[in-house]
């Protein structure tokens, strides 16, 4: 179908303006980003083809430059645009989180941590350093690689927490396997960190394990 043949209210841009972005399908949202189709496909057909070819919208967004650019209708300019959009989204989430209380917006916290960690190919140990009002002072990745009791050093965590004058921490790490269920090693590491930080009156408020499309909160499980 030629895009111009669609009723005006069915055109992605007009539909968004009339009904809001939540009313659009993944393909329609992507079509707005792509702007133009290719020979033989209008922009919505191209968007739908790309989502099916990559497997999902998220897999398209997390593709490498080489994977992205080898697809019909895409190229380096679109890749750069997409990376800019994703970075702006991440910065928006970070700014929103840092302006509020990390505990009163747990879903926002999960969303932000997922955006940082979900698609990483290696395990990464991430910390939110909070003040006594539970506002974010600083966030950083402290360890990367295969995380176990030997590779996450409580002394280094304590050192960074004192450096930032933190009153509390929220921990997070990803499981590249995609399975968010915490391991026994995850629980042991968390307990060691709780004990080490208690010596300097710093609390761990939660530890999130980030998987593929899901996350597990230690606090919600009653483990903290």
From Swiss-Prot:
Task: Indicate which residues form the motif JAMM motif.
Answer: 173-186
One GO biological process term: proteolysis
Q: Which GO terms describe its molecular function?
A: metal ion binding; metallopeptidase activity
Residues involved in Zn(2+) binding: 173, 175, 186
Gene3D superfamilies registered for this protein in UniProt: 5' to 3' exonuclease, C-terminal subdomain, Cytidine Deaminase, domain 2
Its keywords, alphabetically, are: Hydrolase, Metal-binding, Metalloprotease, Protease, Zinc
Q: Please name the Pfam families in this protein's record.
A: RadC, UPF0758_N
InterPro entries, alphabetized: MPN, RadC_JAB, RuvA_2-like, UPF0758, UPF0758_CS, UPF0758_N
CDD domains attached here? MPN_DUF2466
Domain (MPN) spans: 102-224
Q: Which NCBIfam families match?
A: PRK00024.1, radc
Q: Which PANTHER family match?
A: DNA REPAIR PROTEIN RADC (PTHR30471), UPF0758 PROTEIN YEES-RELATED (PTHR30471:SF3)
Name the protein family. Belongs to the UPF0758 family.
The name of this protein is UPF0758 protein VP0184
Upper lineage is: Bacteria, Pseudomonadati, Pseudomonadota, Gammaproteobacteria, Vibrionales
